[in-house]
Each structure stands twice: as structure tokens, then as C-alpha cells.
């Protein structure tokens, strides 16, 4: 409906012009407008009814009241006029009547007494109004003086209710009965207002002194009782302040108000109750004895005329003031007991007891208040506000003098009352924060493991999950995040501390799932660390040891005196959090290890992928969580440069073990725990891999039928040798020796290398690789021992071990021994010690070969082994060991066959299977050799294009043409810096 959308102004315009209304609207629209207008009229009527019913009734009542007041006022005016006229007639009649002169003298004393009594009654009637005015102006002492004057008037006029005598004044003036009853309530009211004023925080010293004087005059108490009343009132104020409703940000104001109240109480206690010893001159900055001077002013007799201050200023202009008796004009309140000054010893003991009594309330109250502070930044804000408040107090020299006079020692608000409470709350917040991080990390770990176990390598649901199954897919996949956006113009040295590129993650074989977990953990640690750093000094220069004596003296307290305790607290909770995560990982690994032990297809089990994830996670936590390092080492000690310098000094032997910083030792301990757990995870994986591969290797080795032996045989080299015949002539003969290991040996090594590279072997811990190779070698020797035992027991149909097969077995065993033996221990010991088991198997195999032939074959066999190891150093890169790969070439290098060997780079590289030329002199020959091989290999290109096929990368490298003019990518400094 168009009418409903029109504005009210348009509606009113249409209604004013009926002709235009009927021209622009139809019948239905006009009916709608009519209904709308009628509804608006009803709404206005309802509003008018409400206004009349609620507001107009009040107006009528107010008008009636005003009219009644007007009539009363007119009546009062008429009565006053009539009284005035009547008095005037009386005066005229009195002046007209003659008086005998004798009666004038005796009537003067009685007339003066009458005027005096009338003036007293007049004053008595006006005192209540004066008392209320004084109470409204918070002048309790003046109200007390008026009240005591009122009591004095009662006694003079014999108005006391306790008096048994007949009171002629009350009988003639009944209004005084009500006045006496009203005056009886003034005492409790003045006492209540005075005690409430004592509880107020922002009251001047003079006002507190007057309030105490009022209490002492009304209760007839001593100065010691006044001190007790003052301290109890302030204790009640402290309790009220601590029990106020809590509103988060108001807690800082509450605590600061509490500290300010304590300081103000001590100042006012000194100003009111402390008296200087004889001989000491008063200090204008430190007033004292104010209570006693005020009492002397109110009750003392000197100087003369002081007491007239109660009435003189207010009543001296009245005509009846001159008729008041002297006892009223010069009235001064009195104390029943003398106000003796309080001794310093009593004042000190009383204040110390009061502070001790308030200390428990303050601790409980502050503890409850701090429960509402949910961040360490909030705690730091409260502490800093207290520091600023107390520093402003302590800058005044009088504060120290005041504390020495009252307590004989400084009052340490922060150290004695607040610091431990803040530390306890800080510890609670830290523990709660890291417990939350631990629980959330455990939930994230369980979720990641469930996702890994529920997904399979064939499901395309999550590409990142596939990288956990096969790290090579992640390593050789391209991503926009591989290089930082500023990699071309920002060097590594100028890059941020926490900046890392995708290539850096790939170089360390850190999968996206591990990156996400570490990023989530590090972000939580960063939030907690940033929150805690607000409580600590911003830099080392703010630490207590660097604060100048002048600054320390002017400060109320050292804000960062507990920085070491807070950092130790943070360190302890951080280590506990990481150990909790490690314990969760250890429990998961143990359960998976028990489940994987009995499985035959363990390599395809999703449980094993979870093991690899947890092993990589433990290996990467220390590097990908830089804020964990900051939590343990501190902000200043966690930088990379000092750590590098420390390691350099350790290598040079300039730093002794005893000189290691405890925080560094704690960080090393955490790294050792993570590395140990990572090694345990990799050990579960390596045990499963070795078990499966050795099982296949042993089955192939023990096959003794002729077909199996021929199927596993490889080509042999044919060599010509010259021998001296019995006649002395040289005889040339040909011998055949194995040049390659058996197919099952090559398959075993290639499968082992493939499994290692599948999990990112270049980033595996060295000890894991060594233990894995050692385990493989032990199992291989066990397989050969089993073969020897079976051959010693002759079976029907079994293929005998010929000399050629014995040569091949011996060649395989020696090759496996060279490849699988870790070189690190041999280099350290200087010379490798032969394994007795290997020697025993070798002797058994050599016994199957003719001794004369063995002597002839051995040198050539060793030469073939040496060439084979060098040729396969790239294909079996990580299996052969980095110590052997990266060693410099010996002088016995055969210059006739440089193209048969493809050495690795002379420095440690990130990817173990990446082939590089070693020298420029061999580059051309190596390139020609690759080109020659590339012409033979093209039929295999169909499989090289599939990155999932094992060994496809190596086939791709040897099948593509190499550009000899292009330098190696890893020799370009700017590109190598991008990968860091």
C-alpha cells in the first residue's frame, strides 16, 4: 500500500486538502487513511488520559496545598497585626496612667529578671534551628557547643525532666515541653554525625579534630578513648572499602584508596595526637597536637572572652541579647577529666596494634579483590598506580620523619602488605594460564592424531594430511609461501627473528600439520608472555641492579625487586607445560608401539603416521615456538646472537661447564627432553621399517632353488689378468667377478632409502639414522648366519652353494657392511673394530671359495667394492652416511673414470639426494656423461613424470639435459639466503 509508506507530513497535507485527497487516492486508500487517523486520535486520547490521571492530579493537590498555605499566612499576618495593635493600646494606656514614684525602684530587679528569663526562653527557642544549620554545614563542634548551651539553659530555667521541683516556666509556656523533648535527640544525632565524619577519607585535619572534640565533650571521654574511636572508625572504613561491589577496573581505585587511607590515617594520627618533646621546635610541614589545642580553645579560660564565640557573632545585634545573664554569654563547655597528652610510647603501641589488626583484614580483602583481576597486566597497573601514589608521598621528607616519630621505623606498604599477595595471584594466573595451554595442546594433539588415523593416503579431503604420509610430496611441491615476499632485497641477517619461509620449513622437513600445531602453541605462549612482560621491566636497564641510588631513594619501593621470582615462576610453569605435552606424546607413543608390534603391514598403518607426526612435533617445538624459549630464558637471553657466541666459545674451550647459566641449562634440558622423545618416536618408526624390510630381505636370501638364485643374480665384470706360468712365461687369463650386489640387496637398500626419504631423511636426528643402520646390519648378519646354518644341514633338492654364489654372497655382505656401518664411531675411535659375527660369516663364505682363486680375486673384488660404493653414494644418499659422502676425494682417484662417479657437494646441503658437481674441471666431463646417459634413458621418462613413483626424481635428474653454462643454484648466494 502506497499510503502506508507515505510520511506523516504528507498525510496531514492530504487531509487538509480533501479535493486533492480524492484526486490522488482511491477509495480503499482513503479508507485506510481514515482508519489510520482514527487510530492516531485514539492514541492521543490515551496519552491525554494518562497525563491527566498521573500529572494533573499532582498539580491539583499542589494547588490546594498552596492555597491552604496562603490562607494560613494571611491568618498569621492578621494575628500579628492584632497583637501589635493590642500592645500599642497597652503602651498608650500605661503611659496615660500616673505612677507613684515610690513603686518604681522596687520593680526594677524583678523586671530585669523577667527580661532575662524571656531572653533565655527566646534563645532556647532559636537554638534548635542553629543546631540544625550547623549540622547541615558539617560544623559538629559548633553544634555541640550549642547543644551544651541548651542543656545549660535547661538547668537555669529548671526545665530538666529529672527535677522534682515544680517548673513555673513550663506551666506558663507549654511550648517549651516540646522544645525540651526535641533537644534530647540532638546528642545522638551529633554523635552519629561526628563518628560518620571520622570515617570519611577526604576530611581535613581540623574537621577530624573538631569531630573528636565533639565526641569527647558529649561522651566526656579522654584523649586515649578519642584515639581508639578514631582508629576504630578508620578500621571500619577500611573494611567498607574492601567490601565494596567489584567492577573490574574499579579494583585499582579501591586498592589505591586503601593505601591512601592508611597514609592519611597515620598523618592525621600525628597531627591530632602526637606532642613534641620539650625543646623541639614545631615543623610547619608536620602539624601536631591539634586535638589538644582545639580542646583548649573550646574549654580553656585563656585568653579571656574566647567562649563568647558561641553566641556573640550571631546574637549580639538582637535587642534581647543584653538581657542574657553572664553565665550564658560567656558559656564554655567543660570536661570532667583533664585532657592529658598521650605519651609517645602509648601512641606507638596503639598504632602498631592497629596496623597489625588491620593487616589481616587488608590481606583477606586484597586477596578477594585480586580474584577479580584476570590478567597480569592488570596486576602491573595496580602495582604501578600504588608506586606512583606512594612515590609522591615519599618524595616529601616529612613522611619519613612522621613514620619514625609514630612507629620508630618506616611503614612499608608494598613489601609488608601487598607484594606477597600480588605474587600469589600472579602464580595462580600463571598456573591457570599454562594449565589451559597444556589442556588445549593436549586436545589439539588428540584431534590431530584422530584426523591422521581417520584419513587415508587416498582420500583427497585434506592435502596437508597427505604430507604426513609422504614427506617427499611436501618437499618437492611448490607453494606461494616458499619464499618471503622481500627475499630478493632483504638479507637473512636483516630479517626478523621469527621470520621463516616455506623453503626453510621444507629444508627442516616440518610438515604443515606440525607447523599449525606449533603456531597455535606459540601464539598462546606469546599471549601469556606478553601479558607477563607487563609485570616485568621493559629492558635490562630497569632491573634493580641498574637503578641509581638517587632514583632508589626517591622511589617508594622497588617495583621490579621480584622480577627474578616472577621469571622463575614463568620458567617453572613453562617447563611443566612442555613436560605435560611430552608426557601426553609419550603415552600416545607407548600405546601405538604396543599396537604396531604385531602388525605385518605396519608401514601402511595410520598409527605409524601418527608416530611420525609426534616425532616431528617434538623435534620442531624448540625451533618453531620461539616464545617458549623466551619463557624459559627470558626476553634478553633468548636472542640468537648470544647463543651463537656461547656455542662458539664452547667449541673453543673458553667456557667451562661450571660457567653455564642456569637458565641456559634449563633450556638445554627442555631441548634434550624434546629430542629424546623425538628419537623415541623415530625409533618406533625405524623398528617397524627395519622389521618389514629385513623380513623381505631374509626371505629372498634364504631362497635356495636354482630359479631364485638366477633371478637375483646380476651381471659380472670380466677382467684380464696376467699370471706367470711354470715355464716363466706370462699367461693372460680372464676372470669374472661380481660388480653389482644382488637384486634383493639393491632392492633392500633402495627400499630403505626410499622409506627414509619418504619421511624427510635429511632432517632425521643423526642418532636415529645410526641406530637404524646398526639395527639393519645386525638383522642382515643374522640372516646370513641363518643361511650358513641351513647350508650346513643338507636338504634334498636344495641348490648347493657354488663358488660363484659364494663370491656373490661375500660381495653382498661386504658391500652391506660398508654401506650400513656408521662412520661416526669409527672416526672417533681411530680404527674400526671388526665384528666377530661378520668375520665368522665371512670366513664361512671364504671357505667355500678356492684359496688360490680367493687370493687372486680379493684385490679386484675390493676395487669393485670401492667403485660401487662411490657410484651408489647418490642413489643411497642418506643410507651411506653423510660422513662418507662429504669427505674430500682422495689422491687415488682414478682420472680415467670421472664420469662414472657423481659426488655430492663439499659442504652440508639441505637435500641429501640433490647431485652437484664438485669442481669445475670435472664439470664438462660429468655433463657429457649425463648427456650420454640421457640418450639411453628416454624410454623411462614415462615413469619419471609421476612424482609419486619411487626414484622418479633421480630418473628425472638423469634424463633431462643439463645446461653446463648455468651455475648451480646452491652456489648463488642470494638464492641460498632465501631458503633460510
Swiss-Prot record:
- One of this protein's GO BP terms? protein transport
The upper taxonomy is: Eukaryota, Metazoa, Chordata, Craniata, Vertebrata
Q: Name one GO cellular component term.
A: Golgi apparatus
Identify its protein family.
Belongs to the COG1 family.
Q: Where in the cell is it found?
A: Golgi apparatus membrane
Checking InterPro entries in the record gives:
COG1
- PANTHER family per the record? CONSERVED OLIGOMERIC GOLGI COMPLEX SUBUNIT 1 (PTHR31658:SF0)
| Organism domain of life | Eukaryota
- Function, as annotated: Required for normal Golgi function.
**Name of the protein this chain belongs to:** Conserved oligomeric Golgi complex subunit 1
Residues carrying N-acetylalanine = 2
Subunit structure comment from the entry: Component of the conserved oligomeric Golgi complex which is composed of eight different subunits and is required for normal Golgi morphology and localization.
Q: Which UniProt keywords apply?
A: Acetylation, Congenital disorder of glycosylation, Golgi apparatus, Membrane, Phosphoprotein, Protein transport, Transport
- Pfam families recorded for this chain? VPS51_Exo84_N (PF08700)
| Membrane topology note | Peripheral membrane protein
Instruction: Please list the residues that carry the modification Phosphoserine.
Output: 7
> Would the keyword Transport be found if you checked this record's keyword annotation?
yes
Q: Does the keyword Transferase apply?
A: no
Q: Which gene encodes it?
A: COG1
Q: Which medical condition is this protein associated with?
A: Congenital disorder of glycosylation 2G: A multisystem disorder caused by a defect in glycoprotein biosynthesis and characterized by under-glycosylated serum glycoproteins. Congenital disorders of glycosylation result in a wide variety of clinical features, such as defects in the nervous system development, psychomotor retardation, dysmorphic features, hypotonia, coagulation disorders, and immunodeficiency. The broad spectrum of features reflects the critical role of N-glycoproteins during embryonic development, differentiation, and maintenance of cell functions.
Amino acid at each position: 500500500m502506497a499510503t502506508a509508506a507515505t510520511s506523516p507530513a504528507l498525510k496531514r497535507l492530504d487531509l487538509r486538502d480533501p479535493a486533492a485527497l480524492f484526486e490522488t487516492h482511491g477509495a480503499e486508500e482513503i479508507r485506510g487513511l481514515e482508519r489510520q487517523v482514527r487510530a492516531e486520535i485514539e492514541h492521543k486520547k490515551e496519552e491525554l488520559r494518562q497525563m491527566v490521571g498521573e500529572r494533573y492530579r499532582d498539580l491539583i493537590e499542589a494547588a490546594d496545598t498552596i492555597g491552604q498555605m496562603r490562607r494560613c499566612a494571611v491568618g498569621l499576618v492578621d494575628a500579628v497585626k492584632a497583637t501589635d495593635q493590642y500592645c500599642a493600646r497597652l503602651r498608650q494606656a500605661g503611659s496615660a496612667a500616673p505612677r507613684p514614684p515610690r513603686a518604681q525602684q522596687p520593680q526594677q530587679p524583678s523586671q530585669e529578671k523577667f527580661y532575662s528569663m524571656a531572653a533565655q526562653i527566646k534563645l532556647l527557642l532559636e537554638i534548635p534551628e542553629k543546631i540544625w544549620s550547623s549540622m547541615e554545614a558539617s560544623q559538629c563542634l559548633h553544634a555541640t557547643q550549642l547543644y551544651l548551651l541548651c542543656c545549660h539553659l535547661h538547668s537555669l530555667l529548671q526545665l530538666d525532666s529529672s527535677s522534682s521541683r515544680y517548673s513555673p516556666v513550663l506551666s506558663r509556656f507549654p511550648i517549651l515541653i516540646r522544645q525540651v523533648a526535641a533537644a534530647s535527640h540532638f546528642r545522638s544525632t551529633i554523635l552519629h554525625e561526628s563518628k560518620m565524619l571520622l570515617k570519611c577519607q577526604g576530611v581535613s585535619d581540623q574537621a577530624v579534630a573538631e569531630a573528636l572534640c565533639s565526641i569527647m565533650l558529649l561522651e566526656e571521654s579522654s584523649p586515649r578513648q578519642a584515639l581508639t574511636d578514631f582508629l576504630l572508625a578508620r578500621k571500619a572504613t577500611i573494611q567498607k572499602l574492601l567490601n565494596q561491589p567489584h567492577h573490574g577496573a574499579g579494583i585499582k581505585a579501591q586498592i589505591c584508596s586503601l593505601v591512601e587511607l592508611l597514609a592519611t590515617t597515620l598523618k592525621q594520627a600525628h597531627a591530632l595526637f602526637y606532642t613534641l618533646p620539650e625543646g623541639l621546635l614545631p615543623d610547619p610541614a608536620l602539624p601536631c597536637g591539634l586535638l589538644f589545642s582545639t580542646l583548649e580553645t573550646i574549654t580553656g579560660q585563656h585568653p579571656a572572652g574566647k567562649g563568647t564565640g558561641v553566641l556573640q557573632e550571631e546574637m549580639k545585634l538582637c535587642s534581647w541579647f543584653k538581657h542574657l545573664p553572664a553565665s550564658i554569654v560567656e558559656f564554655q563547655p567543660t570536661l570532667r577529666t583533664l585532657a592529658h597528652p598521650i605519651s609517645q610510647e602509648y601512641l606507638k603501641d596503639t598504632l602498631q596494634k592497629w596496623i597489625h589488626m588491620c593487616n589481616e583484614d587488608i590481606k583477606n580483602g586484597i586477596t578477594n579483590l585480586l580474584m577479580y583481576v584476570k590478567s597480569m597486566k592488570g596486576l602491573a597497573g595496580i602495582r604501578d598506580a600504588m608506586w606512583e601514589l606512594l612515590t609522591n608521598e615519599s618524595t616529601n621528607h616529612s613522611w619519613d620523619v612522621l613514620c619514625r616519630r609514630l612507629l620508630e621505623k618506616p611503614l612499608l606498604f608494598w613489601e609488608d602488605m601487598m607484594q606477597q599477595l600480588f605474587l600469589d595471584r600472579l602464580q595462580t594466573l600463571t598456573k591457570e594460564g599454562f594449565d589451559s595451554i597444556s589442556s588445549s595442546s593436549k586436545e589439539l594433539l588428540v584431534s590431530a592424531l584422530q584426523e591422521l588415523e581417520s584419513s587415508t593416503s587416498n582420500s583427497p579431503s585434506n592435502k596437508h594430511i597427505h604430507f604426513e604420509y609422504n614427506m617427499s610430496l611436501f618437499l618437492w611441491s611448490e607453494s606461494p609461501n616458499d619464499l618471503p615476499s622481500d627475499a630478493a632485497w632483504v638479507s637473512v641477517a636483516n630479517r626478523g627473528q621469527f621470520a621463516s619461509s616455506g623453503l626453510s620449513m621444507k629444508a627442516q622437513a616440518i610438515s604443515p600439520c606440525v607447523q599449525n600445531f606449533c603456531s597455535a602453541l606459540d601464539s598462546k605462549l606469546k599471549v601469556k608472555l606478553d601479558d607477563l612482560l607487563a609485570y616485568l621491566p621493559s629492558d635490562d636497564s630497569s632491573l634493580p641492579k641498574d637503578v641509581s641510588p638517587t632514583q632508589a631513594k626517591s622511589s617508594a619501593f622497588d617495583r621490579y625487586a621480584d622480577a627474578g621470582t616472577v621469571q622463575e615462576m614463568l620458567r617453572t610453569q613453562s617447563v611443566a607445560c612442555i613436560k605435560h605435552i611430552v608426557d601426553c606424546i609419550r603415552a600416545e607413543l607407548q600405546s601405538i608401539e604396543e599396537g604396531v608390534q604385531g602388525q605385518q603391514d605396519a608401514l601402511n598403518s595410520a598409527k605409524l603416521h601418527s608416530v611420525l607426526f609426534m616425532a616431528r612435533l617434538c623435534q620442531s617445538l624448540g625451533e618453531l615456538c620461539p616464545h617458549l624459549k623466551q619463557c624459559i630464558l627470558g626476553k634478553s637471553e633468548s636472542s640468537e646472537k648470544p647463543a651463537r657466541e656461547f656455542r662458539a666459545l664452547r667449541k673453543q674451550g673458553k667456557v667451562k661447564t661450571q660457567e653455564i647459566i642456569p637458565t641456559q641449562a634449563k633450556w638445554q634440558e627442555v631441548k634434550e627432553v624434546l629430542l629424546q622423545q623425538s628419537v623415541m618416536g623415530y625409533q618406533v618408526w625405524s623398528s617397524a621399517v627395519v622389521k618389514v624390510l629385513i623380513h623381505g630381505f631374509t626371505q629372498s636370501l634364504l631362497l635356495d632353488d636354482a630359479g631364485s638364485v638366477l633371478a637375483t643374480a646380476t651381471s659380472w665384470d670380466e677382467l684380464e689378468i696376467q699370471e706367470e706360468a711354470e715355464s716363466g712365461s706370462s699367461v693372460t687369463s680372464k676372470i669374472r667377478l661380481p660388480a653389482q650386489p644382488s637384486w634383493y640387496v639393491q632392492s633392500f637398500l633402495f627400499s630403505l632409502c626410499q622409506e627414509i626419504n619418504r619421511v624427510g631423511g635429511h632432517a632425521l636426528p643423526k642418532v636415529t639414522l645410526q641406530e637404524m643402520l646398526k639395527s639393519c646390519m645386525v638383522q642382515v648378519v643374522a640372516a646370513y648366519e641363518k643361511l650358513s646354518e641351513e647350508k650346513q644341514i643338507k636338504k634334498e633338492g636344495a641348490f648347493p652353494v657354488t663358488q660363484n654364489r659364494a663370491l656373490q654372497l661375500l660381495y653382498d655382505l661386504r658391500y652391506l657392511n660398508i654401506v650400513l656401518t656408521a662412520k661416526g664411531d669409527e672416526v672417533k675411535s681411530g680404527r674400526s673394530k671388526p665384528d666377530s659375527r661378520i668375520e665368522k660369516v665371512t670366513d664361512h663364505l671364504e671357505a667355500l671359495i678356492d684359496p688360490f682363486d680367493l687370493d687372486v680375486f680379493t684385490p679386484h673384488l675390493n676395487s669393485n667394492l670401492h667403485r660401487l660404493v662411490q657410484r651408489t653414494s647418490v642413489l643411497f644418499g642418506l643410507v651411506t652416511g653423510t660422513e662418507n659422502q662429504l669427505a674430500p676425494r682422495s689422491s687415488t682417484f682414478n682420472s680415467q673414470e670421472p664420469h662414472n662417479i657423481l659426488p655430492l657437494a663439499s659442504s652440508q646441503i639441505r637435500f641429501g639426494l640433490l647431485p652437484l658437481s664438485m669442481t669445475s674441471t670435472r664439470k664438462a666431463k660429468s655433463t657429457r656423461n649425463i648427456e650420454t646417459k640421457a640418450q639411453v634413458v628416454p624410454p623411462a621418462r614415462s615413469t619419471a613424470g609421476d612424482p609419486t613413483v619411487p626414484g622418479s626424481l633421480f630418473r628425472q635428474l638423469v634424463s633431462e639435459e643439463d645446461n653446463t653454462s648455468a651455475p648451480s643454484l646452491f652456489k648463488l648466494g642470494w638464492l641460498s639466503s632465501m631458503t633460510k
